[in-house]
Amino acid sequence: MNGKVRGALVWSFAERYASLIVNIASTMALARLLTPAQIGVYSVCAAFVTVATVLRDFGISEYLIQEKELTDDKLRAAYAGAIAIGWSVGLLALLARHPLAQALREPGVVNVIGILALNFAILPFASPAFALLNRHMEFRKIFIIQFSSSMVHACTGVLLAMNGFGFRSLAWASVANTGFQALLLLAMRPPGTLLLPGVKGMKQVFGYGSYFVTSRLIETFTRNAHEFIIARVFGLTSVGLFSRALGLLEMFYTNVTSAVLRVATPAFADQHRQGGDLPALYAQGTAMMTAIAWPFFGFVALMSRDIMRLLFGAQWDAAAPICTLLALAIMPTYLYSLGPNLLNATGHVAKRLRINLIYSPVHLIVLLIASRFSLEALAGSWIVSHLVALSLYVHYMRSLLGATARTLLGPSLKSAMVAAGSIAAQALAAELSHRAQLPLLIGLMLTGGAGIAGLLIAAQALRHPLAQELMRAFHHLRKRATP
């Protein structure tokens, strides 16, 4: 891992957690200023707009990041495509707001979507510049932009809510966030990138984008299909239990994985343009991800009941076995979590679409079969789908990179041993905590601490890449702290 990637990861994690602190503070304030009904109105509208946002970007940001030879004509075409699609999707959102309000029997939906649609008018001027900062791996600038706009979002929402704007305060906060972000991007964009839109090169932009957005839509549907199946077969209470269990596991994605994936695409694209060793970068990145993810999911699998009871109360105990099974089933995904980014970064979005066209039907069939037995069977069945996805990604990456499966996944064998050491330490600590009948929080802290200690000892003993990176970071910090 080179210094550019390390720096990008530091700034990406810094932005993620700085914004998280701001969001938690604003959420706590808004929860006291707005009623559940007001927040509910905004949430429904935000969900609708989120789906539209997938269409709005149309893969143009990824196109700009991965394009090997980004000429002025291609950049002009990207601006033109962003404006054409963004404004069209915004217009469709405006036209759909009245039927949606009637379907939901909530007139406030008209106002909220009308305000949120302004984002679609602004974003086409911001998203290409943001993509270019990613392309050049300017994550320090991205940190400034994202954190500053998060502050504007939080302050706007709270101030408007205090002045009686109700659910509109959240909508206007979103627009303020987008507008401020666009202004910062105008000032901090890479030099020579503020160009008039053009149509030359539009075919390449839309060719890449059509594959990308189709793949994203299939992934979005597949990722949420289980809720409809569970609701139909087991009822809404089971949907709540399953969602609570899955939501706990998604905390890792939100706070760790997403920060890595934001850096992965530009890092792979940069290596691809320079003719670098992509198999080695993928193998090292995957080894690092699995060494962190597997001990975490092992911790959740072991301690799911205690975690659920501490965070949500005894009424959610039934979600604990579901959480355990999902945690185990998710583990194989971290062997290919960087796969979609690698395919995007090298321009092979068609291969990503082919994978989804195979994986999605398999996943749905597996869920439907498992739903004939129990909710726990459905949760455990996810491992079948994930192993199918793993085999597909390895197959396509082998042919694309000219590398063997051992080259791509070999370093992750050490991660399995690191995870085994960490989970063994956790299991021992958990058993001792339960025998001593320690309070839940103390038991979880001891078990988590034992897991971290086991991870560090095993990683150092096995000379895992994670240990090398941690030692490098430690020496760097000590050097900076020394006068």
Short names for language-model regions:
Residues 1-24, 57, 62-65, 69-80, ...:
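N-terminal membrane topogenesis motif
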Residues 8-23, 170-173, 177, 181, ...:
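Transmembrane helical elements of multi-pass membrane transporters/channels
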Residues 3-58, 81, 85-99, 114-119, ...:
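Signature of the first transmembrane helix
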Residues 395-399, 403-405, 412, 424-483:
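Membrane-proximal transmembrane or re-entrant/amphipathic helices at the cytosolic face
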Residues 110-117, 145-191, 204, 208, ...:
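Hydrophobic alpha-helical transmembrane segments
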Residues 53-72, 134-135, 193, 245, ...:
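Helix-loop junctions and terminal segments of transmembrane helices
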Residues 1, 5, 140, 183-228, ...:
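Interhelical loop/hinge segments that connect adjacent transmembrane helices in multipass membrane
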Residues 2-6, 63-72, 122-146, 163, ...:
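Membrane-interface junctions at transmembrane-helix termini in multi-pass inner-membrane proteins
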